[in-house]
């Protein structure tokens, strides 16, 4: 792995690894995708994008707006796309490297429209507002296992007033010193986002390109469509040097085949079409191979995100991205629960663990509830603990002369214990040590107030919002960013 000054993330190159496919199976998915990209192809709604495809050798039908992308163009684009790029934070200690086969990172969920708030032991659900974005950004700035910040909810209090998405760009950058990933950008406003980023760098566009503190996500429309907005986010992002995340939200049984392998083919075609557009626009553009693909529950009429299928799909996507040499960004830490309860804990663990073991470069979903509609700050704090435990599981059991401990076993002998050994004292932090998960006996727990996990998490949220200090932005620079 290349050396970097980035410290965030967790190394997935050693320890436990999950492999879902043989190389032949990955090739089969690839070749099936190449067939789909030629027949039926992808509908591209944006005239500028169609022209870019046409000028680079793709077959374009202006009447149907269908673009057919030959395999040689896909292969060329994949050769141009970097396998590694750095996401900068305002504080460089939060820089993260997105690298195929590299570290696993976590970010919060986005983008919901409601907040689940804990009040006097009960939960209330309210519309999300701009202040919620600021508070969650501060909480993520504190959370050691959240490596960068994604737009978690919409600022619905400024909806309809114009420039809602610009508010949703400025507020996070000010309230966290970690990198900001905009999950709901508007193509026609990308230049406004760029003005904010450039202002942070004193108007130095070259520095802003070299050290991107901001990135964007767009979603193809399943099945097999690139909207005008998606195309414009890709094109403008590529031209400005902004990292772009092409993320499919296919639904198995709804907008993609009911078989998960078939869903991966649809998903793959959608993501690759966006990545090809980025590379044809500006060769070498920084891109993620993204996924929020899941199943469609034919009985409930919903798209569950706490299901084992979502975990499997996200793990599969991580392997597809590795097959193509691209960094991956996948859904995980997800739940269909309405409040931070046992259902949430179970679902979040399985949907976090599977893609983590597959080596996904970023797993997003922390703090999310209710199939992605709702965000909970208490749940984010709990998820921070869950992630730390998943990291411990990822380590596996290292076997070496030191860890086999033959000398220690012989020294202690029969019937004694290892507590007094220097090795034991030195490795006091070796076992997992979650912040909130309670491992005391019942009597000690009861004596401290008998608080359940959500209550303890709420206390931590209150403490962080009151006391955590985010690295400030110089007043003159802040004024320019607001201009």
From Swiss-Prot:
Signal peptide: none
InterPro entries linked: MttB-like_sf, MttB_Methanosar, MTTB_MeTrfase
Known EC number: 2.1.1.250
GO molecular function: trimethylamine methyltransferase activity
Keyword Acyltransferase: no
A Pfam cross-reference name: MTTB
Biochemical pathway: One-carbon metabolism; methanogenesis from trimethylamine
Keywords associated with the record: Methanogenesis, Methyltransferase, Pyrrolysine, Transferase
Biological processes annotated in GO: methanogenesis; methylation
Statement: the UniProt record of this protein carries the keyword Transferase: yes
Reaction(s) the record says it catalyses: Co(I)-[trimethylamine-specific corrinoid protein] + trimethylamine + H(+) = methyl-Co(III)-[trimethylamine-specific corrinoid protein] + dimethylamine
Enzyme class: transferase
Function: Catalyzes the transfer of a methyl group from trimethylamine to the corrinoid cofactor of MttC.
Subunit and partners: Can form a complex with MttC.
Assigned protein family: Belongs to the trimethylamine methyltransferase family.
Protein name listed in UniProt: Trimethylamine methyltransferase MttB
């Amino acid at each position: 792995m290349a050396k970097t000054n980035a410290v965030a993330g967790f190394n997935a190159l050693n320890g436990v690894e999950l492999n879902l496919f043989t190389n032949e199976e990955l090739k089969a998915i690839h070749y099936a995708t190449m067939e789909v990209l030629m027949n039926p192809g992808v509908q591209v709604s944006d005239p500028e994008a169609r022209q870019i495809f046409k000028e680079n050798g793709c077959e374009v039908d202006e009447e149907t707006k269908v673009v057919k992308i030959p395999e040689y163009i896909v292969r060329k684009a994949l050769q141009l796309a970097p396998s590694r790029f750095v996401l900068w934070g305002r504080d460089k200690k939060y820089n993260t490297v997105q690298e195929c086969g590299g570290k696993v990172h976590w970010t919060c969920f986005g983008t919901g429209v409601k907040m689940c708030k804990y009040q006097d032991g009960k939960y209330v659900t309210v519309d999300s507002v701009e202040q919620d974005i600021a508070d969650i950004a501060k909480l993520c700035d504190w959370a050691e296992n959240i490596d960068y910040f994604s737009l978690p909810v919409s600022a619905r209090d400024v909806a309809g007033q114009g420039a809602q998405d610009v508010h949703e760009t400025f507020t996070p950058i000010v309230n966290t010193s970690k990198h900001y990933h905009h999950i709901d950008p508007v193509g026609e406003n990308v230049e406004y986002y760029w003005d904010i980023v450039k202002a942070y760098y004193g108007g130095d566009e070259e520095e802003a390109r070299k050290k991107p503190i901001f990135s964007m996500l767009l979603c193809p429309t399943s099945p097999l469509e690139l909207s005008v907005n998606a195309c414009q986010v890709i094109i403008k992002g590529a031209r400005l040097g902004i990292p772009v995340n092409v993320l499919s939200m296919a639904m198995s049984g709804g907008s993609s085949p009911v078989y998960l392998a078939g869903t991966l083919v649809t998903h793959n075609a959608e993501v690759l079409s966006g990545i090809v557009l980025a590379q044809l626009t500006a060769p070498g553009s920084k891109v993620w191979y993204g996924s929020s693909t899941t199943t469609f529950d034919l009985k409930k009429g919903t798209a569950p995100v706490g299901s084992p299928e979502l975990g499997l799909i996200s793990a599969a996507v991580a392997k597809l991205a590795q097959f193509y040499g691209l960094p991956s960004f996948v859904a995980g830490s997800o739940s269909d629960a309405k409040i931070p309860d046992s259902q949430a804990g179970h679902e979040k663990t399985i949907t976090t663990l599977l893609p983590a073991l597959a080596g996904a470069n970023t797993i997003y979903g922390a703090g999310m509830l209710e199939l992605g509609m709702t965000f909970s700050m208490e749940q984010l704090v709990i998820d921070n603990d869950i992630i730390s435990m998943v990291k411990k599981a990822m380590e596996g059991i290292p076997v070496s002369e030191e860890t086999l401990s033959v000398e220690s076993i012989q020294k202690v002998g029969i019937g004694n214990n290892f507590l007094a050994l220097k090795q034991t004292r030195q490795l006091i932090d070796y076992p997992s040590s979650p912040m909130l998960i309670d491992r005391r006996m019942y009597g000690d727990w009861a004596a401290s107030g008998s608080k359940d996990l959500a209550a303890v998490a709420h206390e931590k949220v209150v403490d962080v919002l009151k006391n955590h200090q985010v690295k400030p932005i110089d007043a003159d620079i802040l004024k320019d960013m607001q201009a």
